[in-house]
Amino acid sequence: MGQASSQAASGEHSGVKPLGMLVAAVGVVYGDIGTSPLYTLKEVFSGSYGVQVNHDGVFGILALIFWSLVWVVSIKYVLFILRADNQGEGGIMALTALARRASASYPRLRSVLVILGLIGASLFYGDSMITPAISVLSAVEGLELAFSGLEHWVVPLALVVLVALFLIQKHGTDRIGKLFGPVMVAWFLVLGGLGINGILQHPEVLQALNPVWGVRFFIVHPGMGVAILGAVVLALTGAEALYADMGHFGRKPIARAWFALVLPALVLNYFGQGALLLENPEAARNPFYLLAPGWALIPLVVLATLATVIASQAVISGAFSLTRQAIQLGYIPRMHIQHTSSAEQGQIYIGAVNWSLMVGVILLVLGFESSGALASAYGVAVTGTMLITSILVAAVMLLLWKWPPVLAVPVLLGFLLVDGLFFAANVPKIFQGGAFPVLAGIVLFILMTTWKRGKELLVDRLDEGGLPLPIFISSIRVQPPHRVQGTAVFLTARPDAVPHALLHNLLHNQVLHEQVVLLTVVYEDIPRVPANRRFEVDSYGEGFFRVILHFGFTDEPDVPEALKLCHLDELDFSPMRTTYFLSRETVIASKLVGMARWREALFAFMLKNANGNLRFFKLPVNRVIELGTQVEM
């Protein structure tokens, strides 16, 4: 790791006190996993899995939950995966870029790893729909215990909360976001307090910390053992957020928050619920809320609703960040990205993603109507992403970090075995409602691979009739056209060929500018490119220059601002002397060798509706000329 990477990964954010960073991390990172106690044990003992609410059943499940939290979250994510940062950034797309770099010498392996990364990203979007739906539903369902006759109001109230959450996204959460940390700290303290109160009634429940109870559960219930992991995994939902949000807080604050507050609070609450079930098996209908005294029920519902809204906000923000990374890595069409904070570059809003998630969440709430029904569909996307993360990290450990196989392989096999068991336990959920996130993931995977392949084919088609730059410049020397004052910047994907916009301009206008710049924007497999590596400049003579701008997948691609770094006497990028020439291609599906006709038509539709270079690269509107061309694919 480089210095910048190490600082980010370690959480050395200048000007921010460690305690403040820890509280902020609790508010953003741990909302999802922190609201899991609302529905995990409720689902386990719902009757769907055949687990008896007795001494052995409660102890076995508690042992499985505790050791799953220890192995998957504490060991796998906190101790290992948080070290796999891409210059301080985490998440499935950052990890895919890292794995792509690690496997550069193995083209076939590289292709497989990229495909797996895209599948993981696609599943994340499916999870981004289920998390808000199940979290808010489970919180509002507490009203059923407080007031009789409110059962029919749960779904409408949940929809009101969720729709309001999506409506405020455009305005940003900069102001109220400062409350997320304190609210979630209060939530975890309440979780721990409720758990301690329950444990004091039946302290023998702490015996379930012994892993023997989990092993015994598998031995006594061999058929049920693997299947029950499909419910136990609900306690792990949100574990991927530890890695995805690492770029915001760094590794150390996330790890400290987990061990100092989050893990103890979760364990205490789960064991408190277990103690309640030992005393009153009928409490299995909603052990979380029934753990609280009657007078605290309404305040607890309010706090739980706030916590689930914060958890949902974190998932939605994660979807925005993932989309921006995927756009700049070339897997998703360009969309309008709106910044919602003048202070924080990472706080963004993408309308297309926001409204798509909202529609998906509304359909889930209307279709399943309860957190229990949704729990039967939850887990496929989560465990699939966790398994893919382990595979990608394995490639990074062995190929990039060069860990000795004798040390790395046993650890990786342990991760893959546990992740594989959780995933296998959740596969049957596909036929119990879990098809929704899977289908959403399949659709997104098709869109991403179609866009990526379509862009590659488009560049190849444009190259077929292209003119090599040296030949073109030689012809300019022989027959020099009329030159006009100023600088013309032509954006092109291939820096060694003449852009079509340049040929069209010369053909129709019979003039060239004094300085002609062929500009290529390249995105690296790293989050940020330092200013001293931002550009490359080559002079070809006759006033022609090739400029290559380098950006990371979290950088803001502001082309006019970046061109100011090109300090050359011959080049003048002053705003009133610079004109940008863009090409807009219209794709026509044909019988040429490439993609299937339906994928070509899909790509043409996406290209037509994608955000243009003008807005994406922040070009001045009054200094842009756009020329169109048709391309058969």
Curated annotation (Swiss-Prot):
Membrane topology per record: Multi-pass membrane protein
Keywords from the named record: Cell inner membrane, Cell membrane, Ion transport, Membrane, Potassium, Potassium transport, Symport, Transmembrane, Transmembrane helix, Transport
According to its UniProt record, where is this protein mainly located? membrane
Report the GO terms under cellular component: plasma membrane
Catalytic activity reads: K(+)(in) + H(+)(in) = K(+)(out) + H(+)(out)
Task: Give the location in the cell.
Answer: Cell inner membrane
Q: Keyword check for Ion transport, yes or no.
A: yes
* GO-annotated molecular function: potassium ion transmembrane transporter activity; symporter activity
Similarity-based family: Belongs to the HAK/KUP transporter (TC 2.A.72) family.
Q: What does this protein do?
A: Transport of potassium into the cell. Likely operates as a K(+):H(+) symporter.
Per its record, how is this protein called by name? Answer: Probable potassium transport system protein Kup
| Organism in which the protein naturally occurs | Pseudomonas fluorescens (strain ATCC BAA-477 / NRRL B-23932 / Pf-5)
Gene that produces this protein: kup
